Amino acid sequence: MVMRPISNKGLIYRHNICLRCNSTLAVSNHEPITQKTRNFLETTTTSTAIFQCNSQISKHARNGNLQEAEAIFRQMSNRSIVSWIAMISAYAENGKMSKAWQVFDEMPVRVTTSYNAMITAMIKNKCDLGKAYELFCDIPEKNAVSYATMITGFVRAGRFDEAEFLYAETPVKFRDSVASNVLLSGYLRAGKWNEAVRVFQGMAVKEVVSCSSMVHGYCKMGRIVDARSLFDRMTERNVITWTAMIDGYFKAGFFEDGFGLFLRMRQEGDVKVNSNTLAVMFKACRDFVRYREGSQIHGLVSRMPLEFDLFLGNSLMSMYSKLGYMGEAKAVFGVMKNKDSVSWNSLITGLVQRKQISEAYELFEKMPGKDMVSWTDMIKGFSGKGEISKCVELFGMMPEKDNITWTAMISAFVSNGYYEEALCWFHKMLQKEVCPNSYTFSSVLSATASLADLIEGLQIHGRVVKMNIVNDLSVQNSLVSMYCKCGNTNDAYKIFSCISEPNIVSYNTMISGYSYNGFGKKALKLFSMLESSGKEPNGVTFLALLSACVHVGYVDLGWKYFKSMKSSYNIEPGPDHYACMVDLLGRSGLLDDASNLISTMPCKPHSGVWGSLLSASKTHLRVDLAELAAKKLIELEPDSATPYVVLSQLYSIIGKNRDCDRIMNIKKSKRIKKDPGSSWIILKGEVHNFLAGDESQLNLEEIGFTLKMIRKEMELI
């Protein structure tokens, strides 16, 4: 020891933990320590030396600065047990397990905490559990932490049998609450509910940590009543308990109960809310679309002595973005001192979803460290605007691409009608050895369905089977749609019947497929199956049903379904439903009923409604209604040739040639041209598009021969 006078009131000892100031401080094979560390070692006094050195070792280790931590440790002439443990932990935190073992072996004296620290280090670094258990067995005097640490290792590795065995071997005085809580939490995380309940019920002492874990567990099991019963029986609750119960209500769909409990938590005031509680509240307000409550809680935050940290800011901004209040979202973003990729992406995603693409792109260009999410969001944004070239440009600029970005690009082509390009990009994706996911297959199956390309669809189906995702519901629904649109309802129904739990989309797709392929009776039969399943039909279901009634001419049944929409299912019929009914009545010759139905529509009839009436009026030679329908169509679609052509044809049929010429002259004077009909045919795996009267195709003779064969087959049906 070196004594140094400090004042005339006394002396203190300076701990001799460093070498001479003018010498180079080196640590075995390490670089010389920094001047900052040298200064620290020289100014440490005897009363605080070991404690401060231990703290500095831990601090440097957390920051990844092992060199400084080692320097302090090696230059300490006196070390406590905590010093050795701090150095073991420092190496373990930075993945240097061989060095940790070296320090452990060098320890002059090993106590229980030394063994516990080494076992903890091994578990954190996922070392051999067998060796960890051997070390555990070598502990002369095990304590509660020893047992809990080893049980933690078994639980994290999913070795619950060994965890249970060790728990049973744990002395009763060491079980509660540390070891019990470790096993309880492990079972809850693994979803082993019955085992968790057994451990909890077997605990002699149930303190706040174990009870809070069990409240959370009951909520995850869906046993909200049990969770609340335990919550109410607790004599002590912490913020974790309150937050778990509130979140449990929200996840079970009980917003009012969760919000009410939050208010009670605030009123009682014994436990203060924290960032996690508020994040749960903001998420619930977002998911339940409760802007008013969310903004009220935001107001509370500004009055709370609570740090507006990154986590809280992101939660609040996500709520505003998802609810569409972009002004508030931008305001929160503006006041956030720190921002991460979640912050930037949350605002960009919100702007994209609200079609504010220019503003989203401006923010995207400012974003530091753009990631997959931000790139993909912008591709989706420009896809929604129909700017496919910009999507391709962004895709090319991406430093890295994964299956999500490839899928976004393929979906962009599909949603904008570029089906062949979508398939081309899908094959490029496969060539790049990027593995498609279920969303990729749903998109490309949609493309093949739109092209009615059964051969390509079959190949994609085969790849789906090979990749073992044929049981994915979205893929199954896409396969049903593809086969239906390719005219193969038999295979479509085979896929449908293999769906273990079909949803309303599954039923709608199959019913619609039967309907537009002319199998109206099968569509109606499938609807009966839907009703028996207990699932609720929606507007799309009834559109397919009414279309089926049109194909089979079931007027009375069509009326029944149409009226039941409102009376039985509280679904308000839309313009498309009215158009189907007008078509059904018109084809059956009930044109006055069709006209009366249009006059009772609660919404403005669209072109589909008037088009159905015009077509039926021509068929049944009702000039008065045809003229009315044509007039309305011209008002809605002034550039469409359809009303002029159909009305002129009707005049020609009934011998009103002057009116026929008059209508066609009006059409010519307005320079309205009828778009030629377009068709496509697949020959030898290649799609050939052509217009009516088009003779520019190289395979004209082969196309003509194929069309004749199709016509002959149709005549045999």
UniProtKB/Swiss-Prot annotation:
Belongs to the PPR family. PCMP-E subfamily. PPR repeats lie at residues 49-79, 80-110, 111-142, 143-173, 176-206, 207-241, 242-272, 274-308, 309-339, 340-374, 375-401, 402-436, 437-471, 472-502, 503-537, 538-568, 574-604. It comes from the Eukaryota. It comes from Arabidopsis thaliana (Mouse-ear cress). GO terms for molecular function: RNA binding. SUPFAM superfamilies: TPR-like. Gene3D superfamilies: Tetratricopeptide repeat domain. GO terms for cellular component: mitochondrion. GO terms for biological process: RNA modification. Residues 685-715 are annotated as: Type E(+) motif. The keyword Repeat applies. This is Pentatricopeptide repeat-containing protein At1g53600, mitochondrial. Its main location: mitochondrion. Keywords: Mitochondrion, Repeat, Transit peptide. Residues 1-47 form a transit peptide. It is found in: Mitochondrion. Residues 609-684 are annotated as: Type E motif.
